[in-house]
């Protein structure tokens, strides 16, 4: 587990993603062979320009979480955004979930807030262009993400 007070991140050498787990979340991990709806709230910062370039936490998008269908196939995660409920899809015109967003799924729990002490899974990621969305890979820039994940219904 990373120490958020010391700004610690873990680097994954196989893909170049850096991850900090702020909260592992309540609930259970996505099981092998399982497909689930996962809901995300996020801020996306372009590290080249040091600006927030996309978020679904702004008032304009307050009613829309990014919904994705995630499948765990023997520990390998694949996912697509729901075209009708995704700020990422609307902004980048693609339902492909950035590979970097899937890295935490091995380590976090996906649940729903049912009791006062339940928490959403919360991570911070530094995602290189090769693991990001098409716009980031085409224009070669890394992004910093602050994301919460929860299991949908």
Language model: regions and residue ranges:
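Cross-family detector of peptidyl-prolyl cis-trans isomerase
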Residues: 1-153
């Amino acid at each position: 587990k990373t120490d958020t007070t010391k700004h610690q991140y873990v680097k994954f050498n196989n893909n170049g993603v850096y991850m900090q787990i702020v909260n592992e979340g309540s609930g259970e991990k996505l099981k092998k062979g399982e497909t689930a709806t996962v809901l995300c709230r996020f801020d996306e910062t372009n590290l080249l320009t040091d600006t927030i370039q996309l978020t679904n936490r702004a008032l304009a998008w307050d009613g829309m979480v990014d919904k994705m269908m995630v499948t765990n196939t023997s520990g390998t995660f694949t996912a697509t955004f729901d075209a009708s409920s995704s700020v990422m899809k609307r902004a980048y015109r693609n339902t492909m979930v950035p590979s970097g967003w899937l890295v935490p799924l091995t380590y976090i729990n996906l649940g729903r807030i049912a009791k006062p002490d339940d928490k959403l899974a919360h991570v911070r990621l530094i995602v290189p262009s090769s693991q990001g969305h098409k716009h980031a890979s085409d224009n070669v820039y890394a992004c910093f993400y602050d994301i919460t994940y929860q299991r949908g219904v």
